[in-house]
Amino acid sequence: MVISTVLGRPPSTSDVDCTVKYSIPESDQVRSNILDPSVQIFMIIERVVVEVYSRKRISIRIADYVSRQLKGWASRWLLDLTKLTVEHNGVSRSTVIGACSTLCSYYYGIMLLTRPFLIYEIYEHLGASLRGGGTQNDHRQKRKYADAALDAAASFVETLRAVIDTEIMPRRMPLIVWVIVTPSSTLLLTLSDPGSSRQRLF
């Protein structure tokens, strides 16, 4: 999946064959199976790679569809995983690291989906006319997704920093080290323009 995302190509060396009923959790404690939300979020990321980056196009319709999947995932897992990264009493080191990695994957998935809209907004701000029609509602939706890219980047960094401050994070975390480039570049794109009104978000 990491290689597929880097190349912007569909994962041709894998296939989805899953019979797990994710809507019926076996336990109310997320710490009992941290792999479950991780598998789910990577399946959503796979859809972003296939629907957006392999086809090199994005639309409001596709963004809305994947956004609903991300919201469904968040409603089930986000709060519990966040608690595991900030409340360490009685929680194993591996569980905290797993929760952090899964949360970072979630924010990374949001950034993958919404970054094209942020780039669109930056081009517009720089004076490049890219509007190819569309209603006012379409433009509001694009702005909403652009803002979501920034929010996800900030949340990614905050989540990672909170766990790093506990000094339980291993020095070598290849997945997190690799994906940190995305939120960093997303935030730098915005902050590099002194006149950008989006700086107020930070």
Give residue ranges: language-model regions.
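Extended, leucine-rich alpha-helical cores of fungal transcription factors
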Residues: 1-76, 89-202
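Conserved small-domain helix->loop->beta segment predominantly found in fold-type I
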Residues: 81-90
